[in-house]
Design a protein with these regions (language model features):
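Extended, well-ordered protein cores
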Residues: 1-10, 14-63, 72-285
Length: 285
């Protein structure tokens, strides 16, 4: 089967600047071995995404993680969950709330199974230890831009169920982020903690105007239903600009850059650099 996307977003350079990212293959993330490793190592398990911005792709990835952690629960009660309209992409909190539609004895039995799975699996990093809100309760509760720097500053630890910091395994499914934080962690291991007092700071100016880059990807992000090919086609000439073979369950995402947002980005950066009297570095990969 083929899915075609017709585009007419041309840059001033005379060609479309489009970015392809394939985040999963066959809808499977290697989460199982990470949960097992976290359990064996006695560290907290955590997943770091950005569901607030990547509104299509990241809740899907979050759902895969939730299904893997509670694999036996989902396998045993899949039909019941489907009848209740439960979607793993919405998180554990939503699942627990939807169980209230069931007779109390049935709901209590499933809740007990969930508790058992959490006891037998690795301990989860907490969003709110006092209220029992885990990393897997709500997709948007842990935002990678904030959660990973905080974890690194805290020597690779997050909060456990007792409200105490504990060594943590951070799973970052999106390769765009993973390499950056891995490099940061490796540097801290070699050179010690980052210290703004001695190293200074770097203000960041994001490329965001007119839904540039990933901010405009929502209507061009798809969870692939069947194996086949995704093609990006020029709507005027019919030329195939790019194509990718995909499997069922893959997440296919396309970003875009236009001329005006880049110009706006440069203007903002230059203005910021002049006001703060700091050098400007432009990074557009």
């Amino acid at each position: 089967k083929k899915k075609e996307i017709r585009v007419n977003q041309w840059s001033s350079l005379g060609f479309p600047l489009l970015v392809f990212e394939s985040e999963t293959r066959g809808g499977i993330l290697p989460t199982g071995r990470h949960t097992a490793d976290a359990k064996k190592s006695g560290v907290l398990f955590s997943v770091h995404l950005k569901a607030t911005m990547m509104k299509v792709s990241d809740p899907i990835i979050f759902g895969h993680v939730l299904r893997t952690y509670f694999q036996e629960v989902f396998q045993r009660h899949d039909a019941t969950f489907e009848s209740l309209g439960i979607d793993a992409n919405d998180g554990l909190e939503n699942l627990l709330g939807d169980l209230e539609q069931l007779p109390e004895d049935q709901a209590a039995s499933i809740r007990k199974e969930i508790e058992t799975a959490m006891e037998q699996g690795p301990s989860l990093a907490m969003v709110n230890s006092d209220k029992g809100i885990t990393n897997l309760h709500v997709p948007s509760d842990i935002i990678i831009d904030a959660s990973m720097p905080a974890m690194i500053r805290n020597s690779g630890r997050m909060w456990n169920a007792q409200g105490k910091p504990q060594d943590t395994k951070a799973v970052i499914p999106d390769s765009s982020y993973a390499g950056v934080y891995q490099a940061t962690i490796d540097d801290c291991k070699e050179n010690g903690a980052l210290d703004p007092k001695t190293m200074g700071t770097v203000p960041n100016v994001g490329l965001m105007a007119q839904k540039a880059e990933e901010y405009g990807s929502h209507d061009k992000t798809f969870e692939i239903a069947d194996p086949g090919t995704v093609r990006v086609v020029d709507q005027h000439s019919g030329e195939v600009l790019m194509e990718h073979a995909v499997s069922a369950g893959d997440i296919w995402r396309m970003c875009q850059v236009k001329d005006k947002p880049v110009r706006n980005w440069v203007e903002l950066a230059v203005e910021r650099a002049r006001l703060s009297n700091t050098p400007a570095v432009f990074w557009l990969d």
